[in-house]
A protein has these predicted regions:
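Short linear motifs embedded in intrinsically disordered, charge-biased segments
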Residues: 57-60, 71-94, 98, 105-377
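Conserved pre-catalytic core of RNA-dependent polymerases
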Residues: 1-98
Length: 377
C-alpha cells in the first residue's frame, strides 16, 4: 500500500470483517512472514528491479557502489571474527533499505496483487484474504512461486492462517497448505501493532493497549511518581509518551461502553499514582484531571474516531481506504438476531453526542474545531 499509513490497513481489515460478520459469511486470511526478510534479497534481483522501475542509471550506479566490496565482522564472546564479504541482502540499518525492499516486493508480486482489502502489503507485512479456503490456498501458492523463484522464502512456521467462521457452519478440512506443509491456525493475530480476532471483536486489542500504556508509564515512573516534579509537567509527559501508546489503533475500534470504561479505569489509576493519591483519599476524578491537565481518555478516543472519519470522508473516491470501506457483500442477506456493533454505528453515536453531522466534514478546520477535546487547564 504505497503512500498509506498502518492505520489504513488496520481499518480496511476491521471494516471488511464487520461487513462479512453482519451478513454471516466466512472470511479466510493468511498472514505471510518472510524468512530473514532483508537478508535474503539477491543482489541481481535488486539491480533487475531498479532497472524495471526505470530508476535513473546514475542512482543505480551509486547504489551499486554502496554495496560493492562490503565487508563485515561479528562480535563474539571470544572477540571479533575476521572480515568476510556480504553478497546478498540489503544493508541493515540503512534508511534506503526499506525503500529498496518495497520496490523489490512490489515488482515481484505486481501481476498477482489483488485490490485492497483482499491483498495488503505494508513493507514485509502481507495479508491475503479470500471468501474460501480453496481461493486462499490458490493465492498463497501464487505468492510462494512469485517470491521463492527470485530467492526469497516464506516461513513455514511463522506464516499463519485465521478463519473467521461468521456463518457458524462446519466445513471440511480447514488446512491451508504451503509447499505441502500445513501452516499454523490462529484465533488472534497481531497485525501492524493491532490485534485482529477471528470473531471481529476487540477485547484483545483493548487489553494490549492498556498493557502498552502501563509499559510506557512504568518506564517513566521515575519522573511520573517524583513528588518534586510539578503535576502539570507530569501531565505533559503523560500526554506525550503514555497516552499515544494507549490510543494507537483506537480510531478503528467499534468500541462498547465496557471497553471505554476499561480504558478510563486504567488511565485514572495512572493519574492517581502520578499525583500521589489513592481512592481512599476520596478525591474526585475531575479534581485529579484538573491537577495534571489531562482530559478523559474516553473523550480522546471519540475525538480520534471522528478525526479518522473526517479523513476518510475527505479522501477522493478512488482512494484505497475509501474503496475498501465501500466493499459490499453480494448475494447475502443479513443474518437473524441483533446486529453486532459496527464502527459506523459508533460514529453516528459520536456525532449525536456532539450535535454535528457528516455534512461538516468537508470543512476540515471547522470539523477539527468541533470534535476537539481540550485538556483541562
Amino acid at each position: 500500500m504505497p503512500g498509506r499509513s498502518t492505520m489504513e490497513a488496520i481499518f480496511l481489515l476491521r471494516r471488511l470483517m464487520e461487513k462479512y460478520r453482519e451478513k454471516k459469511k466466512d472470511l479466510h486470511m493468511v498472514f505471510i512472514d518472510l524468512e530473514k526478510t532483508y537478508d535474503k534479497v539477491p543482489r541481481q534481483v535488486l539491480w533487475w528491479v531498479l532497472e524495471k522501475k526505470k530508476v535513473p542509471t546514475k542512482y543505480v550506479e551509486v547504489i551499486k557502489d554502496m554495496y560493492e566490496g562490503v565487508l563485515t565482522r561479528v562480535r563474539t564472546v571470544d572477540g571479533m571474527t575476521g572480515e568476510f564479504p556480504i553478497t546478498i541482502g540489503v544493508h541493515q540499518g540503512s534508511s534506503l533499505s526499506p525503500y529498496l525492499f518495497a520496490l523489490v516486493m512490489d515488482e515481484l508480486t505486481y501481476n498477482i496483487q489483488d485490490r485492497a482489502p483482499w491483498c495488503m502489503l505494508f513493507a514485509d507485512d502481507i495479508v491475503l484474504v479470500d471468501e474460501t479456503r480453496e481461493g486462499l490456498n490458490s493465492k498463497l501458492g501464487m505468492w510462494r512461486n512469485a517470491l521463492e523463484s527470485k530467492g526469497l522464502r516464506l516461513s513455514r512456521t511463522k506464516t499463519e492462517y485465521m478463519e473467521c467462521n461468521f456463518s457458524k457452519t462446519r466445513g471440511g478440512p480447514n488446512d491451508i497448505i504451503l509447499d505441502g506443509q500445513t501452516i499454523p491456525t490462529k484465533d488472534v493475530f497481531k497485525y501492524l501493532g493491532s490485534f485482529i480476532q477471528q470473531d471481529g471483536a476487540i477485547e484483545h486489542d483493548v487489553n494490549h493497549r492498556i498493557k502498552a500504556g502501563w509499559v510506557k508509564w512504568r518506564s517513566a515512573s521515575g519522573v511520573l511518581c517524583d513528588p518534586k516534579i510539578p503535576n502539570r509537567l507530569k501531565g505533559k509527559f503523560y500526554k506525550s509518551a503514555v497516552r499515544p501508546a494507549m490510543l494507537y489503533g483506537t480510531e478503528c475500534w467499534a468500541v462498547k461502553k465496557q471497553h471505554s470504561h476499561k480504558m478510563g479505569v486504567a488511565e485514572m489509576r495512572m493519574l492517581r499514582w502520578m499525583t500521589g493519591h489513592t481512592r481512599n483519599d476520596r478525591i474526585r476524578n475531575e479534581e485529579i484531571r484538573r491537577k495534571v491537565e489531562v482530559a478523559p481518555i474516553e473523550e480522546k478516543m471519540r475525538e480520534n474516531r471522528l478525526r479518522w472519519f473526517g479523513h476518510i470522508q475527505r479522501r477522493p473516491m478512488d482512494a484505497v481506504v475509501k474503496q475498501g470501506d465501500m466493499v459490499q457483500v453480494p448475494g447475502v442477506r443479513r443474518g437473524k438476531g441483533r446486529p453486532k456493533l459496527t464502527w459506523g454505528t459508533v460514529i453516528e453515536k459520536d456525532m449525536a453526542v456532539l450535535g454535528i453531522n457528516e455534512n461538516l466534514v468537508l470543512d476540515r478546520c471547522e470539523w477539527r474545531k468541533r470534535i476537539h477535546i481540550a485538556d483541562p487547564n
